[in-house]
From Swiss-Prot:
This is Histone H2A.v. It is found in: Nucleus; Chromosome. Changing A90T: In strain: ZBMEL131. Residues 1-20 are annotated as: Disordered. GO terms for biological process: DNA repair; heterochromatin formation; male germ-line stem cell population maintenance; membraneless organelle assembly; negative regulation of peptidoglycan recognition protein signaling pathway; protein localization to chromatin; protein localization to nuclear body; somatic stem cell population maintenance. Residues 1-12 have a biased composition (Basic and acidic residues). CDD domains: HFD_H2A (cd00074). One of its GO terms (cellular component) is nucleosome. GO terms for molecular function: DNA binding; protein heterodimerization activity; protein-containing complex binding; structural constituent of chromatin. Variant histone H2A which replaces conventional H2A in a subset of nucleosomes. Nucleosomes wrap and compact DNA into chromatin, limiting DNA accessibility to the cellular machineries which require DNA as a template. Histones thereby play a central role in transcription regulation, DNA repair, DNA replication and chromosomal stability. DNA accessibility is regulated via a complex set of post-translational modifications of histones, also called histone code, and nucleosome remodeling. Phosphorylated. Phosphorylation of Ser-138 occurs in response to DNA double strand breaks (DSBs) generated by exogenous genotoxic agents. Phosphorylation is dependent on the DNA damage checkpoint kinases ATR and ATM, spreads on either side of a detected DSB site and may mark the surrounding chromatin for recruitment of proteins required for DNA damage signaling and repair. A motif ([ST]-Q motif) lies at residues 138-139. There is a cross-link at K121 (Glycyl lysine isopeptide (Lys-Gly) (interchain with G-Cter in ubiquitin)).
């Protein structure tokens, strides 16, 4: 068949498929995030192509930030495995992440905190006239 389309691609090698994540330089799956965004919209699934890339970049950055802080927390405690406790310490220790992530982390425990009014005053040293030396008073009566 002369003039047909059969020989159109015969001289060229087919280009290898490049994912949108690779094009954007991301590790998170842009295509999967785009699919989830489309399934959760009410306007008949119309989501711009760059919205998925931007969302994937945000999720990747936040994940990297939390994992870095949790890794530092686990390293401070001299263990090699990140646990929910380390994630809790990392998120609650950072002011911006704490305001962003309000979720309760299962198995995360609590953050130690003592209110300033409950902390005792500085110890005062008073000369005791009957004893030789200083006496430490923990509370003023």
């Amino acid at each position: 068949m002369a003039g047909g389309k059969a020989g159109k691609d015969s001289g060229k090698a087919k280009a290898k498929a490049v994912s949108r994540s690779a094009r954007a330089g991301l590790q998170f799956p842009v295509g999967r995030i785009h699919r989830h965004l489309k399934s959760r919209t009410t306007s008949h699934g119309r989501v711009g192509a760059t919205a998925a890339v931007y969302s994937a970049a945000i999720l990747e950055y936040l994940t990297a930030e939390v994992l870095e802080l949790a890794g530092n927390a686990s390293k401070d405690l001299k263990v090699k495995r990140i646990t929910p406790r380390h994630l809790q310490l990392a998120i609650r220790g950072d002011e911006e992440l704490d305001s962003l992530i309000k979720a309760t982390i299962a198995g995360g425990g609590v953050i130690p905190h003592i209110h300033k009014s409950l902390i005792g005053k500085k110890e005062e040293t008073v000369q005791d006239p009957q004893r030789k030396g200083n006496v430490i008073l923990s509370q003023a009566y």
